[in-house]
Regions:
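Short solvent-exposed coil/turn linkers within tandem alpha-helical repeat scaffolds
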Residues: 45, 92-101, 129-137, 165-173, ...
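Structured, soluble extracytoplasmic/luminal domains of envelope-associated proteins
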Residues: 89-145
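N-terminal positive-inside, membrane-proximal cytosolic segments immediately preceding the first
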Residues: 1-28
Length: 225
């Protein structure tokens, strides 16, 4: 009983010493939580909806270009806006905290890559990220292409490998990615890397389209089976 009383007294002492601090911290948590809910409901969600509305027609035009070709006029509209369409550069800048703003960076990077502006392609694509592995794989592959065009072979090779590894459970996508990385390694003198990746395609993805021809590429590098 005495021990219980001591615990109670210590609890009272704690409250007496720290009551103002506890109240302040508790109030701060409540206030921050309330502010976050208010921000989410009254600012962030409407902002996301607005960004989606602005990006929707741009995504339609981008999809059409991906199928028919990246004409100069269409790319300019996608990037900078026109004909009642907001450009992805403005959407990415104004709505950077939204999913649509993130997708706008991907589109901008792809457009820059297709028009030969490789430095800006790198800038936009490095700012893009998604949990959708197929899309992230494509972004990494484009980064590899941009770095290759800038003669930055080490970064190009790194992103080609990342393009494959981020989606390595998908046999088609991963085998294509690793094969591309292997070819790039072969053409840039990274012989040991090329051998390792060609063998990975053959051994890890035996049913892929490239697996049956891998021994031919290995033979070119002096590896005979």
């Amino acid at each position: 009983m005495q021990e219980t009383n001591e615990v109670v007294e210590k609890a009272k002492d704690f409250w007496a010493k720290f009551s103002n601090q506890v109240i302040y911290v508790g109030s701060a948590v409540i206030i921050v939580g309330g502010l976050w809910l208010a921000y989410s409901n009254f600012i962030q969600k409407p902002k996301e909806a607005k960004a989606d509305d602005l990006l929707f027609p741009v995504e339609g035009l981008f999809d059409k270009m991906a199928q028919t070709g990246f004409s100069k006029d269409s790319v300019n509209i996608v990037l900078n806006g026109g004909n009642g369409i907001a450009g992805v550069l403005k959407i990415a800048s104004t709505y950077s905290s939204t999913p649509a703003g993130n997708r706008a960076k991907y589109i901008a990077g792809a457009c820059y890559l297709h028009t030969g502006d490789y430095a800006n392609a790198v800038k936009e694509l490095k700012d893009f990220s998604t949990k959708a592995t197929q899309v992230q794989s494509a972004a990494y592959s484009m980064l590899g292409d941009a770095y290759a065009e800038l003669n930055n072979n080490d970064d190009a090779f790194t992103y080609y490998k990342k393009s494959a590894s981020v989606n390595d459970k998908d046999e088609f996508s991963a085998s294509e990615g690793y094969f591309k990385a292997a070819l790039f390694a072969q053409t840039t003198g990274k012989t040991s890397d090329a051998i390792e990746l060609f063998q990975k395609v053959r051994d890890d993805y035996p049913n892929s389209a490239h697996a049956r021809d891998i021994d031919k590429y290995l033979a070119q590098l002096g590896v005979l089976n």
